[in-house]
From Swiss-Prot:
EC number: 4.3.1.3
Positions of post-translational 2,3-didehydroalanine (Ser) modification: S149
Keywords: Cytoplasm, Histidine metabolism, Lyase
Recorded GO MF terms: histidine ammonia-lyase activity
GO BP field: L-histidine catabolic process to glutamate and formamide; L-histidine catabolic process to glutamate and formate
Name of the protein this chain belongs to: Histidine ammonia-lyase
Pathway(s) the chain acts in: Amino-acid degradation; L-histidine degradation into L-glutamate; N-formimidoyl-L-glutamate from L-histidine: step 1/3
Modification note: Contains an active site 4-methylidene-imidazol-5-one (MIO), which is formed autocatalytically by cyclization and dehydration of residues Ala-Ser-Gly.
Family: Belongs to the PAL/histidase family.
Range of residues in the leader sequence: none
Length: 515
C-alpha cells in the first residue's frame, strides 16, 4: 500500500488516502514512485508507439484537439503539436495558486499518470516528481478552468515549466523555468506524442480545490462541536437532547455520531450542569437542542463528499485512455469533473450550515432573557457594549455564506465552439469553499469568545475536562472582558487558534474522514 511517513511518500498509483492527501497539503513531501507502476506505464507508451508505427489515426495522438479532432497531424509535426498545445492552453488569469495547493495538484497528477492509461513516459513523470521533491512549484493562475475538458489552462501552466517556459516558485522566490528546472536537477523536456494532452487533461486542479475545502470543513466541524458544547454550558442548557436513545430512534448515522461526540465533550456532569439540575426550564431553543440533528446532517455531507473526492484523487481522468493489453486507445469523458462539482456543492451546504447554527447560538447568548447572562455578556451595560457588534459581524459572515452556497454544478457554459457544450464549473465550486470556510472561522471565533465569556461570568463554575481545555486554550491568548476594548484583535487571535486546528484533538479522530 501507499505509505506516508513524516515527509516521505512511497506512491503506489491509485492508493492515496484522504489522510495522506491532507498531509501532502500541509507540508512538503519527498515522493517516490513504487516500482510496481513501471510496467504498466511502459506498456502504455509502447501502445502509443505501435499506433504511430502502424499509421493508425487516434485522437490526441496524431490529431488536433477539441473541435479540431478531425485534423490529422503529420508525423514530423507531432512533437511541435504537443508543445503548441501546452503553450496555447496556458491562458489562465488571476493570482498564483499557493504552494501547498500546487504541490497537491502535482501529486494528484503523478498519481493519475502513473496508473498507466495515459501513454506518457516515465521520464516525464519522474520530472514532475523531481520538481515536487525539490519544492519547485510552477506558477499556476487561480482562474481559467470550467472543469471540462479537465482543468486545461491551469494544468498547462503547470506543464509549461517542464518545457522550460513560464516560471516557478522555490522557497518563496520566483525563478524562470530553466533556472527552476536546474534547482531540481532537470533540463527542459521535449514531449512525445500524447504527452502534452496527458499532462493537461484531468480533474486534478478541481479535485485539489475541493480537497482543501473538505479539510477546512472538517476542521470547522470539529471546532463547532466544541464551541457549541461550550455555549450549552454557558447558557445552562440541557444535556437531555444529546441522549443516545433519541438519536438511535431516528437512525441517521451522522446524527448518532455527532450526538455521541457532544456527550463526550459535555461529560456526564459538570459544575455547570449540577448548578441547574433542578431548574424549571423544559426545552432549549433549537440552536442548542437540535445541534446533533443539524451537525449530524453536515457530517453526512462531509463524509459523502470525502468519499467522492478520495475516489477522484485516485482516478484516471485523462482522455483518450490507452488500454495497452488490447492495443487500443478510446476517447471518452473522464475529464468531466461533475462528481467533484457536486461534492463541492454539498460541502458548501455543510459549511454554510455550520456557520449559520453557530451564529444563532451567538445571538442567543446576547439575549439576557434567553441566556440568563448580562446583556451582550458584559457588566455595566450602556457604558459597555460588549459583544453587541461582534454578533453583528457573525451575522454578516453567515449571510455572505448563504449566497456563496449557491450550487455551481447547475451552471454551464458551452466552450470550444460548442464541442464542449456542457461543463461542470468544478473549480469555482471548490474555490468558493475557501472563502466560506474563512467566514465560518470568524463566526466560530466569536462564539468561542462569547461562550468562554459567558462561562466566566458564572463565577466559580467549572465545565467538563475537555471543555475546560478549550476554555484554557482561548484564555491563553484572550483575557476576560472586564470592560470594552478594541475587539477585532481578539477575534483575530481566536481565528488564528482555530486555524491551528487546536480543537481537533478534542473530538474522536474516527469522526472525520481525513483525520
Amino acid at each position: 500500500m501507499t505509505t506516508l511517513s513524516a515527509k516521505t511518500l512511497n506512491l503506489i498509483p491509485g492508493q492515496l488516502t484522504l489522510a495522506q492527501l491532507r498531509a501532502i497539503h500541509q507540508q512538503p513531501v519527498s515522493l517516490t514512485l513504487d516500482s510496481s507502476a513501471n510496467q504498466q506505464i511502459d506498456d502504455s507508451v509502447a501502445c502509443v508507439e505501435r499506433i504511430l508505427a502502424e499509421n493508425r489515426t487516434a485522437y490526441g495522438i496524431n490529431t488536433g484537439f477539441g473541435l479540431l479532432a478531425s485534423t490529422r497531424i503529420a508525423s514530423e509535426d507531432l512533437e511541435n503539436l504537443q508543445r503548441s498545445l501546452v503553450l496555447s492552453h496556458a491562458a489562465g488569469v488571476g493570482q498564483p495558486i499557493s504552494d501547498d495547493l500546487v504541490r497537491l495538484i502535482m501529486v494528484l497528477k503523478v498519481n493519475s499518470l502513473s496508473r498507466g492509461f495515459s501513454g506518457i513516459r516515465r521520464v516525464v513523470i519522474d520530472a514532475l516528481i523531481a520538481l515536487i521533491n525539490a519544492e519547485v512549484y510552477p506558477h499556476i493562475p487561480l482562474k481559467g478552468s470550467v472543469g471540462a475538458s479537465g482543468d486545461l489552462a491551469p494544468l498547462a501552466h503547470m506543464s509549461l515549466v517542464l518545457l522550460g517556459e513560464g516560471k516557478a516558485r522555490h522557497k518563496g522566490e520566483w525563478l524562470n523555468a530553466v533556472d527552476a528546472l536546474a534547482v531540481a536537477g532537470l533540463k527542459p523536456l521535449t514531449l512525445a506524442a500524447k504527452e502534452g494532452l496527458a499532462l493537461l487533461n484531468g480533474t486534478q486542479v478541481s479535485t485539489a480545490y475541493a480537497l482543501r475545502g473538505l479539510f477546512e470543513g472538517e476542521d470547522l466541524f470539529a471546532a463547532a462541536l466544541t464551541c457549541g458544547s461550550l455555549t450549552v454550558e454557558a447558557v445552562l442548557g440541557s444535556r437531555s437532547p444529546f441522549d443516545a436513545r433519541i438519536h438511535a430512534a431516528r437512525g441517521q448515522r451522522g446524527q448518532i455520531d455527532a450526538a455521541a461526540c457532544y456527550r463526550e465533550l459535555l461529560g456526564e456532569s459538570s459544575g455547570v450542569s449540577e448548578s441547574h439540575r433542578n431548574c424549571d426550564k423544559v426545552q432549549d431553543p433549537y440552536s442548542l437542542r437540535c445541534q446533533p440533528q443539524v451537525m449530524g446532517a453536515c457530517l453526512t455531507q462531509l463524509r459523502q463528499a470525502a468519499e467522492v473526492l478520495e475516489v477522484e484523487s485516485n482516478a484516471v481522468s485523462d482522455n483518450p485512455l490507452v488500454f495497452a493489453a488490447e492495443n487500443d486507445v478510446i476517447s471518452g469523458g473522464n475529464f468531466h469533473a461533475e462528481p467533484v462539482a457536486m461534492a463541492a456543492d454539498n460541502l458548501a451546504l455543510a459549511i454554510a450550515e455550520i456557520g449559520s447554527l453557530s451564529e444563532r447560538r451567538i445571538s442567543l447568548m446576547m439575549d439576557k432573557h434567553m441566556s440568563q447572562l448580562p446583556p451582550f455578556l458584559v457588566a455595566n451595560g450602556g457604558v459597555n457594549s460588549g459583544f453587541m457588534i461582534a454578533q453583528v459581524t457573525a451575522a454578516a459572515l453567515a449571510s455572505e455564506n448563504k449566497a456563496l452556497a449557491h450550487p455551481h454544478s447547475v451552471d454551464s457554459l458551452p466552450t470550444s465552439a460548442n464541442q464542449e457544450d456542457h461543463v461542470s464549473m468544478a473549480p469555482a465550486a471548490g474555490k468558493r469553499l475557501w472563502e466560506m470556510a474563512e467566514n465560518v472561522r470568524g463566526i466560530l471565533a466569536v462564539e468561542w469568545l462569547a461562550a468562554c465569556q459567558g462561562l466566566d461570568l458564572r463565577e466559580g463554575l467549572k465545565t467538563s475536562a475537555k471543555l475546560e481545555q478549550a476554555r484554557s486554550l482561548l484564555r491563553s491568548k484572550v483575557p476576560f472582558y472586564e470592560k470594552d476594548r478594541f475587539f477585532a484583535p481578539d477575534i483575530e487571535a481566536a481565528s488564528q487558534l482555530l486555524s491551528s486546528t487546536c480543537l481537533n484533538p478534542l473530538v474522536p479522530a474516527r469522526l472525520l474522514p481525513s483525520l
